[in-house]
Amino acid sequence: MVPSAGQLALFALGIVLAACQALENSTSPLSADPPVAAAVVSHFNDCPDSHTQFCFHGTCRFLVQEDKPACVCHSGYVGARCEHADLLAVVAASQKKQAITALVVVSIVALAVLIITCVLIHCCQVRKHCEWCRALICRHEKPSALLKGRTACCHSETVV
């Protein structure tokens, strides 16, 4: 059985279509560029020199898919070209600085009170011979200490 010209044409067309399908599904690159993973391809490029002053208070980035520049604004600025000051950000930053300052001041005062308290406790417990501590203790000393036959801390007298 000899194939007809129509059958040969269909066979050749099938081979060409199979080859085209194989090329479309191929993972090998058709160009000389190395393959790039999808996660590495960025949606942004650096702006061309013609757009270096596009953003007023920010960094210019070029959107690849939309083929137009966009801005990444510095802190405290908003807008398409970072042209507006963000007053809420300025107020929030100021309030944050005030809160930090207040926290530092309160911490320093609390630390000073703690140190003074520790010094007073040490002075009054260990060094009762200190005149200032003795005056402080004697002011708060109860007379019952004198009545029980103990030595008073303020006077070296013993009550019998």
UniProtKB/Swiss-Prot annotation:
Q: Which UniProt keywords apply?
A: Cell membrane, Disulfide bond, EGF-like domain, Glycoprotein, Growth factor, Lipoprotein, Membrane, Mitogen, Palmitate, Secreted, Signal, Transmembrane, Transmembrane helix
Q: Which residues form the signal peptide?
A: 1-23
User: Disulfide bonds, which pairs?
Assistant: C47-C60, C55-C71, C73-C82
Membrane-spanning segments: 99-124
InterPro entries named among the record's database cross-references:
EGF-like_dom (IPR000742)
Cytoplasmic compartment residues:
125-160
Tissue expression: Isoform 1, isoform 3 and isoform 4 are expressed in keratinocytes and tumor-derived cell lines.
Q: What function is annotated for this protein?
A: TGF alpha is a mitogenic polypeptide that is able to bind to the EGF receptor/EGFR and to act synergistically with TGF beta to promote anchorage-independent cell proliferation in soft agar.
- Report the protein name in the record: Protransforming growth factor alpha
Q: Which organism is it from?
A: Homo sapiens (Human)
Name of the encoding gene: TGFA
